[in-house]
Amino acid sequence: MRFSNRVALVTGAGGGLGAVIAERLAREGLTVAVNTRARTEEADAVAAAIRAGGGRAFAATANVTDPSAVRRMFETVADRGTLRVLVNNASYRPRQRVQTITEDDWHQVRSVTLDGAFRCIRCALPTLIPGGRIVNVLGRNALAGDPERVHLSAAKHGLLGLTLALAAALRDDGVAVNAVSPGVDTEGPELDRCRAEIASQVARLAFADAAELTGTVVRVDCDGSVVSAPTVW
């Protein structure tokens, strides 16, 4: 095992891509905190599957839009070990025509996708410094606008900006901050292979040397190609 008594927290891990990422990190030897918003049975099922496969995992239910719930979640994580990896995967992805998006719709998407990531990062930093790893999951919405998810595209692009700014801010603290950007929509059972490729890249970034790899967006196009390059504006 690479880490002993080390924890990775994966948000939005009750199913789909988040669950696959959680399973992959557990195979790498990390204890995984499986976060879901409110459906404890989903987190319990993913954690149980990891344990059945010989890994270590536990449920960590919290709505990332609620600062108090996020703080309590990190207290639970601290009771299980030392947090070394944070994967911000939670997002809210409604399809809406831009003409129908209300103020509440806009703020709800941002509160989960962007603000939720910031809340988790803020709580994680005391234990991530020094030497921790943050991996943010973007998506094609961040790099190419989605006409049916304008609010999500804006929030994911904000998460890209947060990734780059944090990489610069935390470099001297030995914390690597990177992002993975799936090139396709990761919803649907037909994309199991794609999810595995994405999870593999998340695991690579979780163990990357901060001095060599930070402020990088890894684009996974799910056709066998991976593009990894620093993003410079």
Question: What is the predicted function of each stretch?
Answer:
Residues 40, 61-72, 103:
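The beta1-alpha1 cofactor-binding region of Rossmann-like NAD(H)/NADP(H)-dependent oxidoreductases
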Residues 30-43:
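Conserved glycine-rich Rossmann-like NAD(P)H-binding loop of the short-chain dehydrogenase/reductase
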Residues 97-98, 105-110:
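Substrate-binding pocket helix/loop in short-chain dehydrogenase/reductase
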Residues 172, 179-180, 189-228:
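C-terminal helical subdomain
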Residues 121, 155, 163:
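Active-site helix of classical SDR
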Residues 126, 168-169, 211:
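Alpha-helical segment proximal to the catalytic Tyr-Lys
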Residues 7, 14-15:
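Conserved glycine-rich cofactor-binding loop
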